[in-house]
UniProtKB/Swiss-Prot annotation:
It comes from Salmonella gallinarum (strain 287/91 / NCTC 13346). Belongs to the rhamnose isomerase family. It catalyses: L-rhamnopyranose = L-rhamnulose. Keywords: Cytoplasm, Isomerase, Manganese, Metal-binding, Rhamnose metabolism. This is L-rhamnose isomerase.
């Protein structure tokens, strides 16, 4: 440890102690908050099912930065490189299309055995795994409908895919000793004016009930459902709207997924957390950065990321909120994208843990909004960076921007050699 870092740490401890914050306790609490990294940043949501297939479902990955992963071995190597540069507990979030098999596997036939390499890798890297059925980029989703499809046979295919995915998810939890959160998102919707908005939602309701009919130990598997305002090609009507899934999660007591990019640009999910927690047992968060639409830019340490972290910490939702990331930027180094976004999420959590929340809550309750605002602003200037650097040091990860040296070396020696 450098003398400069030690001096900054000691000064930071004193500054935060003056406002009633124990920085050691803040770091202990930060180690209770894993962030689930999403595998699909590493290959632009391509997966291993059909490397020649196109990305569909109203989502889009833009850019053509060289070096994207072409197979599971490369993707895991890239993830390991990123993991080494991010302090604290982490998880990995997989989509069904990241299965491994020597022969083609239909999506309704996926099994735990197709993900055994991921489980062994997760064990070696001390990671939990989360999961998602992939209800897009498939011939049977080409017309824009999956679980709400009017054709019963096609609808059943997607029901069976989701049921098979739940078994994979439960396998993850059983093998790794930590529950896998499996999130269901479907692209179902219509481009233009829709006459019958009810029938697809009725079909979706019945399909979801069939999907979750098999019971699993919640210590191994947790169901989550995710809404969206619109997607490309589904601008006018989305079957799985916010109201639909809020009602579903409340009535079925599943987890509800809130994606930062899945609402109107003037809405923020930080404001939805406390409302939803009154009705659902758990929340899954997809922290992202929408730029004018659900563009899935890399997460910044911006006001909304900070507000999301603050809501989790202020209301002590550590055991009820699962933090995941969801962005995919193909215009920059993909390993760097993981590192930037995940470190920013963890920085936001640390800053929230360093807030004198009890004092601020008392001021609010007494109606002293002037001092509340003043202290919230003064809090931003306290030396949280020194606490962050100590956290990085204790987890043997680079401080500051030093991690870039490792990424540049990896790009030169590994990524640049991929065609």
């Amino acid at each position: 440890m450098t003398t400069q870092l030690e001096q900054a740490w000691e000064l930071a401890k004193q500054r935060f102690a003056a406002v009633g914050i124990d920085v050691e306790e803040a770091l202990r609490q930060l180690d209770r908050l894993p962030v689930s990294m999403h595998c699909w940043q590493g290959d632009d949501v391509a997966g291993f099912e059909n490397r020649e297939g196109s990305l569909t479902g109203g989502i889009q990955s833009t850019g053509n930065y060289p070096g994207k992963a072409r197979n599971a071995t490369e993707l895991r190597a890239d993830l390991e490189q990123a993991l080494r540069l991010i302090p604290g507990p982490k998880r990995l979030n997989l989509h069904a299309i990241y299965l491994e098999s020597d022969t083609p596997v239909a999506r309704d036939q996926i099994k735990p055995e197709h993900f055994k390499n991921w489980v062994e890798w997760a064990k070696a890297n001390r990671l939990g795994l989360d999961f998602n059925p992939t209800c897009f980029s498939h011939p049977l989703s080409a017309d824009g409908f999956t679980l709400s499809h009017p054709d019963a046979k096609i609808r059943q295919f997607w029901i069976d895919h989701c049921k098979a995915s739940r078994r994979v998810s439960a396998y993850f939890g059983e093998q790794l000793g930590t529950p896998s959160v499996m999130n269901i998102w479907i692209p179902d919707g219509m481009k233009d004016i829709t006459v019958d908005r009810l029938a697809p939602r009725q079909r979706l309701l019945e399909a979801l009930d069939e999907v979750i009919s098999e019971k699993f130990d919640p210590a191994h598997h947790i169901d989550a459902v995710e809404s969206k305002l619109f997607g490309i090609g589904a601008e006018s009507y989305t079957v799985g709207s916010n109201e639909f899934y809020m009602g579903y999660a409340t009535s079925r007591q599943t987890a509800l997924c809130l994606d930062a990019g899945h609402f109107h640009p003037t809405e923020v999910i930080s404001d939805k957390i406390s409302a939803a927690m009154l009705y659902v047992p758990r929340l899954l968060l997809h922290v992202s950065r929408p730029v004018r639409w659900d563009s899935d830019h890399v997460v910044l340490l911006d006001d909304e990321t900070q507000a999301i972290a603050s809501e989790i910490v202020r209301h002590n939702l550590f055991d009820r909120v699962h933090i995941g990331l969801d962005f995919f930027d193909a215009s920059i180094n993909r390993v760097a994208a993981w590192v930037i976004g995940t470190r920013n999420m963890k920085k936001a959590l640390l800053r929230a843990l360093l807030e004198p929340t009890d004092q601020l809550r008392q001021l609010e309750a007494s109606g002293d909004y002037t001092v509340r605002l003043a202290l919230l602003e003064e809090q931003k200037s306290l030396p949280w960076q020194a606490v962050w650097e100590m956290y990085c040091q204790r987890h043997d990860t680079p401080t500051g921007s030093q991690w870039l040296d490792s990424v540049r070396t990896y790009e030169k020696e590994i990524l640049s050699k991929r065609s």
